[in-house]
Curated annotation (Swiss-Prot):
One of its GO terms (molecular function) is structural constituent of ribosome. Keywords: Ribonucleoprotein, Ribosomal protein. It comes from Synechococcus sp. (strain RCC307). Gene3D superfamilies: Ribosomal protein L17. Belongs to the bacterial ribosomal protein bL17 family. InterPro entries: Ribosomal_bL17, Ribosomal_bL17_sf. PANTHER family: LARGE RIBOSOMAL SUBUNIT PROTEIN BL17M, RIBOSOMAL PROTEIN L17. Pfam families: Ribosomal_L17. SUPFAM superfamilies: Prokaryotic ribosomal protein L17 (SSF64263). GO terms for biological process: translation. This is Large ribosomal subunit protein bL17.
Length: 116
């Protein structure tokens, strides 16, 4: 039984779910905003905020953890350079989720997640 399982399944096996969240996190940090389903946006928020917190820490170990998660090496270096000045006074809450119109076809709840 799956009592108190805190991971949103998102209808995928674990390896596919992790790859999808890594790709969405990379895209969100690169572009600044991503349109996706509401459930994916909520799962993406946790991963993105974890990466920004690592970037604010700025240590070598944090940089290596981020390099192991985010697909683009130059993006990690840019994130670590700009995170402390952009989010230095903020303790969490680096993203914003805005609900939009349902998706045509399957009526899934859609949302825009963006960096604050």
């Amino acid at each position: 039984m799956r009592h108190q399982c805190r991971v949103p399944q998102l209808g995928r096996p674990a390896d596919q779910r992790k790859a999808m969240l890594r790709g969405l996190t990379t895209q969100l940090i690169r572009e600044g905003r991503v349109t996706t389903t509401k459930a994916r946006a909520k799962a993406l928020r946790d991963e993105t905020e974890r990466m920004i917190s690592l970037a604010k820490d700025g240590s070598l170990a944090a940089r290596r953890r981020a390099l192991g998660y985010i697909y683009d090496k130059q993006l990690v270096h840019a994130l670590f350079d700009k995170a402390s000045e952009r989010y230095g006074d903020r303790n969490g809450g680096y993203t914003r989720i805005i609900r939009t119109v349902p998706r045509r076809g399957d009526n899934a709840e859609m949302a825009i997640i963006e960096l604050v």
